[in-house]
From Swiss-Prot:
Transmembrane segments: none annotated. It comes from the Eukaryota. This is Phospholipase D alpha 1. The lineage of its organism: Eukaryota, Viridiplantae, Streptophyta, Embryophyta, Tracheophyta. Residues 1-36 form a propeptide. Belongs to the phospholipase D family. C2-PLD subfamily. Ca(2+) requirement for activity depends on pH. Active either under acidic conditions with micromolar levels of calcium (PIP2-dependent) or at neutral pH with millimolar levels of calcium (PIP2-independent). InterPro entries: C2_dom (IPR000008), C2_domain_sf (IPR035892), PLipase_D/transphosphatidylase (IPR001736), PLipase_D_C (IPR024632), PLipase_D_fam (IPR015679), PLipase_D_pln (IPR011402). Its cofactor is Ca(2+). It is found in: Cytoplasm; Membrane. GO terms for cellular component: cytoplasm; plasma membrane. Residues 327-366, 656-683 form the PLD phosphodiesterase domain.
């Protein structure tokens, strides 16, 4: 049967199955006794636990709760709001009986896509078939209702944010908040006079903010509460390191600062991920050095309450699924929540809530500036914070290159800050143990309730919404019934409730986009349902999030309409760790497959329009790197790396990648998403890694009638200045072919300088072409002369792993 593209939203309801015959083993008096015995002694199957799933061809897009002991006529009455970007011939409903390990297939029902593609509502009983497409015993049917709405029917499709009344992303746990203030941070610190003049609307110029200095001030000035979550929190780092910008008490470590505040009576609560994984392959690759045990030991016996919290599964998974969650997934949110003084209220004792959200953990290896030096800070700010997990045996005593760290964070003020606080309270209530959260109601005469910090008329005001990837295993207070979950903007699964709103936010922003999208992310892989087979079975990969496919379909739609649209993506050269290792190579392989899927969509669309254009003029990938000549007076290590090692080669060539740890997307210079979530399945799933992100815009700086020139525009231009080492008039319009061609040319030049044998000057900028090629069919191929990353034996295109499970590396 012919496949159709379902690109839009599918509303589906699964009602019930009639007259189901599951073999009769659980029916009758003796069947009940058998089930009870099995349940009591913990063997066998116990009672029936029937559930239904929804698939679009090879992609699982919906799952009901389990109905216990209703073997003949299970009734679910569950509705689903499904974002789709899938080629499919059928919408498939599968009925299964859950087991402690795996599930027993009852049968499948098929609704042809051509019945729904034009938007008609389909409400019918559909015959359930076996694997050979024959009716199952008893002729059972499933009652379903379906209605499909294509993206063209969405009033926001291709429209951007049309007015200040834009309500935010629908069907989410947290609503959009008005009257907020947002500070945007590039890297942990920016030295004085780094950014040149970047004009904004109203005659203003962009002013960069300093993340770790602001976090230091926020913690230092807190009087009632300091709440922190992190993938890692390392007590030995200092937040203030710029000798030209000293602060009173700034030489103290994070650990000592938190102890000091707790001893003063401030409630200091930390939720740090408990790395209890036994997956040795990751540990030996250097991916999990979180210091969690050291942090717990440091605070033991102090007034700081530090909880190491594992990534516990929700209650609904099978034994295998629960083991996967607890052993393979992490708590990845990076937030700080404090009480803060009121701005401009001379002498007021009232306090408010301020929150920080983004990609930067308070741990080693994160402090950096936009200069991203490899060697020149090894005797100063990075001497005691040398981070280089990509070489075996790397150490400050053997010298650079260190691994520079590029990241993005945000500070949130106003009602949105309280949503971040509520997220912490939900997590602490679930995994924090003692109920020692500050009772804010008892401080209502001191801490003001959620209220705007800026008037809507103020031209600097923000509207902001909080998004998460999290489930009931990590957050308390989620509703239990599917109906209540749907009303709360949550997704119900097989007896687990999931907040998947980060993925929803990305999908909505991409669909709204008019002109261009700029992405920086630590990972870029997904939409595996659309990958070519090419040595894999795509349905076994389960990296099902839609973001890459949404991006390529957006570009295709613009090509078909003859409208300009560009997507710029910045990723690291490789995921942090030994680049030759199986896990890193597997991720690079998934990344190649993702890129190739997107480029094939673009090439086919260009060909259909009779265009012979370079697909990199529509979608282009970059990485960051630095290269420095040796200067007099530089740090001289006492030892040397092993001869002929990658470490030694990189040291002699004076080059290394700048690690892109960012999780950010900018759309049309008017909307920005910043958080902890990577563009992979772990982060976007909702039931894997726990994540948090903000999405916001300035209602007075939209791109509706003229280019947006608010803080988001200034932030992007500042980032481009950091990466390119220059500003140019063409950068003002990233949607123009002149802009993308210029950025591609510069990055090609910088790659040539980075990878050349000789070095006469410092690299003039950091933005490098991602070293792959795209052929006339859209296949991602080896960049001529570069099978391996410079100084390594690591394949740039990656290598499929024959033994690492995809769930670990996607």
């Amino acid at each position: 049967m012919a496949q159709h593209l379902l690109h839009g939203t599918l509303h589906a309801t699964i009602y019930e199955v009639d007259d189901l015959h599951t073999g009769g083993l659980r029916s009758g008096f003796f069947g009940k006794i058998l089930a009870n015995v099995e349940e009591t002694i913990g063997v066998g199957k116990g009672e029936t636990q029937l559930y239904a799933t929804i698939d679009l061809q090879r992609a699982r897009v919906g799952r009901t709760r389990k109905i216990k002991d209703e073997a003949k006529n299970p009734k679910w009455y569950e509705s689903f709001h499904i974002y789709c970007a899938h080629l499919a011939s059928d919408i498939i409903f599968t009925v299964k009986d859950d087991n402690p390990i795996g599930a027993t297939l009852i049968g499948r029902a098929y609704v042809p896509v051509d019945q729904v593609i034009h938007g008609e509502e389909v409400d019918q009983w559909v015959e359930i078939l076996d694997n050979d497409r024959n009716p199952i015993h008893g002729g059972s049917k499933i009652h379903v209702k379906l209605q499909y709405f294509g993206v063209e029917a969405d009033r926001n499709w291709n429209q951007g944010i049309k007015s200040a009344k834009f309500p935010g992303v629908p069907y989410t746990f947290f609503s959009q908040r008005q009257g907020c203030k947002v500070s945007l941070y590039q890297d942990a610190h920016i030295p004085d006079n780094f950014v040149p003049r970047i004009p904004l609307a109203g005659g203003k110029n962009y002013e960069p903010q300093r993340c770790w200095e602001d976090i230091f001030d926020a913690i230092s000035n807190a009087q009632h509460m300091i709440y922190i979550t992190g993938w890692s929190v390392y007590t030995e780092i200092a937040l203030v390191r710029d000798s030209r910008r000293p602060k009173p008490g700034g030489d103290v470590t994070v650990g000592e600062l938190l102890k000091k505040k707790a001893s003063e009576g401030v409630r200091v609560l930390l939720l740090v991920w408990d790395d209890r994984t036994s997956v040795d392959v990751l540990k030996k690759d250097g991916l999990m050095a979180t210091h969690d045990e050291e942090t717990e030991n440091f605070f033991r016996g102090s007034d700081v309450h530090c909880i190491l919290c594992p990534r516990n599964p929700d209650d609904g998974g099978s034994i295998v699924q629960n083991l996967q969650v607890s052993a393979m997934f992490t708590h990845h949110q990076k937030i700080v929540v404090v009480d803060s003084e009121m701005p401009s209220r001379g002498g007021s004792q009232m306090r408010r809530i301020v929150s920080f959200v983004g990609g930067i953990d308070l741990c080693d290896g994160r402090y950096d500036t936009p200069f991203h030096s490899l060697f020149r800070t090894l005797d100063t700010v990075h001497h005691d914070d040398f981070h280089q997990p990509n070489f075996t045996g790397a150490a400050i005593t053997k010298g650079g290159p260190r691994e520079p760290w590029h990241d993005i964070h945000s500070r949130l003020e106003g009602p949105i800050a309280w949503d971040v606080l509520y997220n912490f309270e939900q997590r602490w209530s679930k995994q924090g143990g003692k109920d020692i959260l500050v009772k804010l109601r008892e401080l209502s005469d001191i801490i003001i309730t959620p209220s705007p910090v800026m008037f809507q008329e103020d031209h600097d005001v923000w509207n902001v919404q909080l998004f998460r990837s999290i489930d009931g295993g990590a957050a308390a207070g989620f509703p239990e019934s599917p109906e209540a979950a749907a009303e709360a903007g949550l997704v119900s699964g097989k007896d687990n409730i999931i907040d998947r709103s980060i993925q929803d936010a990305y999908i909505h922003a991409i669909r709204r986009a008019k002109d261009f999208i700029y992405i920086e992310n630590q990972y870029f892989l997904g939409s595996s349902f659309a990958w070519a087979a090419d040595g894999i079975t795509p349905e076994d990969i389960n990296a099902l999030h839609l973001i890459p496919k949404e991006l390529s379909l957006k570009i295709v739609s613009k090509i078909e309409k003859g409208e300009k649209f560009r997507v710029y993506v910045v990723v690291p050269m490789w995921p942090e760790g030994l680049p030759e290792s199986a896990s890193v190579q597997a991720i690079l392989d998934w990344q190649r497959r993702t890129m190739q899927m997107m480029y094939k969509d673009i090439v086919q669309a260009l060909r259909a329009q009779g265009l012979e254009e370079d697909p990199r003029n529509y979608l282009t990938f970059f990485c960051l790197g630095n290269r420095e000549v040796k200067k007099e007076g530089e740090y001289e290590p006492a030892e040397r790396p092993d001869a002929d090692s990658s470490y030694m080669k990189a040291q002699e060539a004076r080059r290394f990648m700048i690690y892109v740890h960012t999780k950010m997307m900018i759309v049309d210079d008017e909307y920005i998403i910043i958080g902890s979530a990577n563009i992979n399945q772990r982060s976007m799933d909702g039931a894997r890694d726990s994540e948090i992100a903000m999405g916001g815009y300035q209602p007075h700086h939209l791109s509706h009638r003229q280019p947006a020139r608010g803080q988001i525009h200034g932030f992007r231009m500042s980032l481009w200045y950091e990466h390119l080492g220059m500003l140019d008039e063409t950068f003002l319009d990233p949607s123009s072919v002149e802009c993308i061609e210029k950025v591609n040319r510069i990055s090609d030049k910088y790659w040539d300088l980075y990878s050349s044998e000789s070095l006469e000057h410092d690299l003039p900028g950091h933005l490098l072409r991602y070293p792959v090629d795209v052929d006339g069919e859209g296949d991602v191929t080896e960049f001529p002369g570069f099978e391996f990353f410079p100084d390594t034996k690591a394949r740039i295109l990656g290598t499929k792993s024959d033994y690492l499970p995809p769930i670990l590396t996607t």
